[in-house]
Design a protein with these regions (language model features):
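N-terminal beta1-alpha1-beta2 submodule of the flavodoxin-like/Rossmannoid cofactor-binding fold
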Residues: 1-130, 134-153, 215-233
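Substrate-binding cleft of secreted/luminal carbohydrate-active enzymes
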Residues: 209
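Short beta-strand elements in bilobed, periplasmic/extracellular small-molecule ligand-binding domains
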Residues: 55-61, 195-206
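Short, glycine-/small-residue-rich phosphate/pyrophosphate-handling segment
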Residues: 138-140, 157-203
Length: 233
C-alpha cells in the first residue's frame, strides 16, 4: 500500500487505471454548497485530475444523490433477508443488469442508489474517494458501502455467484493526521471481503501532517491545501 502522496504516485495511479476499459469514480467528501462554489474537497480534486487523463471514466459525486440509510436487513430477528430475490428492484431503466436487490430501494421510491449500481455493473474498475473523519471514512462513504451490502450477501451467505468478481476496486482517502493509513487498510480488507478484485496499486492515502491526533493545530489545517497542491503538482 502506497503511503505518502506525491506527483509520481498520481502518475502511477493513472497508468494503472488506463488498463481498464471503463472506470467508475465515486467521490464521497462534501462541503456546504456555497463553499463548493469556491473550493473542492482534496479527494475530489484527485478524482477530477485523474479522470481527465482517462478515455472512459465516469465520476459520480455521492453526496449529490439521495441515498437512504441501510435498513440492517442482514441481521433481522427472522434471519438474514438482505439481497434475497424478493428484494429485486423491478425497473429495467434503473436495474438493467437485474442484479440490484435492496429493500431500501423498494421501500423508498426516491432512493438513488440505482444510479451507482447501474454504472458499477457496467464498469470493470471502481475507485472510492473519501475523507477521514473521526477515525473512519466519512459518512457518505459509510452510508454507500453499507447500502451495497446486498452485493456481498448474495454469495456470502446466500451461496449465489459473486457478481463483482471481475470488477477491480480501489480506495483513495485524504486525512489530516495518523488515521488515514488505518482507514485505507480497513477498507481494502472490506472490499476484498465484498468480492471485488482488489488492485493493490489503487489503495493509498495522503496525510497533511505526520502527527498524532492530539497534536493537531489550526495552522496545520490552514496549510493542508497548499501542501496538498505542492505534493501533487
Amino acid at each position: 500500500m502506497i503511503k505518502e502522496g506525491n506527483h509520481k504516485k498520481l502518475l502511477e495511479t493513472i497508468k494503472t487505471l488506463k488498463k481498464y476499459k471503463k472506470v467508475l469514480f465515486l467521490t464521497c467528501s462534501n462541503r456546504y454548497q456555497k463553499i463548493l462554489e469556491k473550493q473542492t474537497p482534496k479527494s475530489t480534486i484527485l478524482a477530477k485530475v485523474m479522470a481527465k487523463e482517462l478515455d472512459n471514466c465516469k465520476i459520480i459525486n455521492v453526496p449529490d444523490l439521495n441515498i437512504h440509510p441501510c435498513e440492517g436487513n442482514v441481521s433481522r430477528e427472522d434471519g438474514n433477508r438482505c439481497g434475497i430475490k424478493e428484494a429485486l428492484l423491478k425497473d429495467k431503466e434503473k436495474n438493467p443488469s437485474g442484479y440490484h436487490r435492496c429493500w431500501a430501494s423498494l421501500h423508498n421510491p426516491d432512493d438513488e442508489l440505482w444510479k451507482i449500481s447501474k454504472e458499477l455493473f457496467e464498469s470493470d474498475c471502481v475507485v472510492f474517494f473519501a475523507s477521514v473523519r473521526w477515525g473512519s471514512a466519512n459518512m457518505f462513504y459509510q452510508k454507500l458501502i453499507e447500502r451495497l451490502n446486498w452485493i456481498n450477501n448474495r454469495y456470502i451467505p446466500l451461496g449465489e455467484s459473486n457478481i463483482i468478481k471481475n470488477i477491480a476496486s480501489g480506495f483513495i482517502c485524504i486525512g489530516q493526521h495518523d488515521d488515514a493509513e488505518k482507514v485505507c487498510a480497513v477498507q481494502k480488507d472490506c472490499h476484498d471481503y465484498y468480492g471485488f478484485k482488489v488492485d493493490d496499486k489503487l489503495y493509498w492515502y495522503w496525510m497533511a501532517e505526520d502527527i498524532d491526533f492530539d497534536e493537531e493545530t489550526l495552522k496545520g489545517y490552514l496549510e493542508s491545501y497548499p501542501e496538498f497542491f505542492e505534493e501533487f503538482k
